[in-house]
């Protein structure tokens, strides 16, 4: 008699995805971040659900409802901080996951990669709208500045911004719709994750060498289930240390001041995980140019499969490309730092140089490095 997990229509799907899935025997810990993102998503949906039970999306009560959650709701403080810092962990895992894909050439799985880019945009939109909900100073001004960028679109810009705001400024209508979208988007993300996995399981996982591992597969369970559980435990440990010892480390003190349209904070900046894109936006003096650079800084990922010139898939045996990859990582860290600094010398120049370097590395230097490496190997 066939095992029920192999015959039952529902269990069969679970079995083929998480138990009997053939996986390469040599995938390293960099492959853990996909499952960690799943853990983050589930945790964010659960903590978010409990927060939504007590939150009110009204400009007069939003700020005090968050304070009420922290003070009066049973374990409300830990739910709130798990949700806020969980977003930071989500983005750390996301960026490492994308970086892993870049380093090991996983972007040659085109469908999986493109769904991943859509996922990245959706998660960024969700996080942005979530940041607006506590209705602190940075929530309000962040929402005003970022939505206002759409006014740079020729002809329809101003109308579009007012349509998104639901009025002539960021107000009650904006907060209510942001809450509605912030609630629904994680479920859309979950559906996209299923599509992402569907495409991945059509081809099977990549591995550090970048060559086919068809002749050397092992079952996902117990080998990678145990490995993923260890990763998840480490993630939860780091998150709990952050939440229990310094929950406000990654936040902005300005967000503990209720939103005031009459008082602009001295430095308007988004959460730390958007600072690299914010730095690219600010490095261009023209509004429309800045907005285009901002969008392209993420959308450029879609061009990477077309810019792959090397005859090897992975960077594992390509030292020049490896050097450029780590320069790119350092450049993104520099941009993150610049995004949090005021717009004054020398930060303006550093931001502009780092922005030019970012696009140059991806569009010119890395493809050229691939060609040079082919020549060195006489391919």
From Swiss-Prot:
Q: Which residues bind heme b b562?
A: 83, 182
Q: Where does heme b b566 bind?
A: 97, 196
Q: How does it sit in the membrane?
A: Multi-pass membrane protein
**Which GO biological process annotations does it have?**
mitochondrial electron transport, ubiquinol to cytochrome c
Residues the record lists as binding a ubiquinone = 201
Family of this protein:
Belongs to the cytochrome b family.
| Cited PANTHER family | CYTOCHROME B
- Additional remark text: Heme 1 (or BL or b562) is low-potential and absorbs at about 562 nm, and heme 2 (or BH or b566) is high-potential and absorbs at about 566 nm.
Q: What is this protein called?
A: Cytochrome b
Native source organism of the sequence: Camelus bactrianus (Bactrian camel)
